[in-house]
Regions:
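FNR/FR-type flavoprotein reductase catalytic core
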Residues: 1-41, 108, 113-166
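Ferredoxin-reductase
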Residues: 37-131, 147-148
Length: 166
């Protein structure tokens, strides 16, 4: 791409290539907005089960409706919860750590009510459509073979749960 822009600049002069750079920038930003922010690259899932293991904590099991994401223990995904029976989702993508990865591709997310959207997720019901992006992160990817001591509290326990459950 850089060589193409350099060639266009050399052949047609600065004014034409400036428009090409502006056009390329608009297309790049537009694609990013459509693909990432609007969820075009997201995978469809559905809420299959919901648990409340503690006050203000929701654990939800998401089953894949298509090819599942390949998630390693401790990674996180961006999730957008949509409308379902008795639930009006936020519709925005928010990051959540995966606390369990099942063999069938189902994922468990542990969500603490900290803001408006996560507070609303406390009323989540099975059947709600979810779109997932990711996975992201490399939490303890290259773990040593030696013994480890893990220290965590609150919802920060989530990546450790994924490692324990795997």
């Amino acid at each position: 791409m850089g060589l193409g822009l350099g060639h266009a600049w050399f052949v047609s002069g600065f004014s034409n290539s400036l428009w090409m750079v502006v056009l390329l920038t608009i297309v790049s930003v537009g694609w990013r907005l459509l693909r990432a922010d609007r969820g075009m690259g997201a995978r469809p899932y559905e809420v299959s089960q919901v648990y409340h293991p503690a006050a203000h904590i929701t654990e939800t099991i998401l089953k894949p409706l298509a090819k599942p994401l390949l998630v390693a223990p401790g990674q996180f995904v961006s999730a957008a919860f949509f409308e379902g029976p008795y639930f009006q989702g936020c519709g925005d993508f928010h990051p959540y750590t995966v606390s369990q990865v099942a063999e069938d591709g189902s994922l468990t997310l542990s969500i603490k009510a900290l803001g408006a959207c996560t507070q609303h997720i406390q009323s989540l019901q099975p059947g709600v459509a979810v779109r997932l992006q990711g996975p992201y992160g490399t939490f303890l990817l290259n773990r040593p073979v030696a013994s480890e001591v893990w220290i965590a509290a609150g919802i920060g326990l989530t990546p450790f749960l994924a490692l324990l459950r795997s």
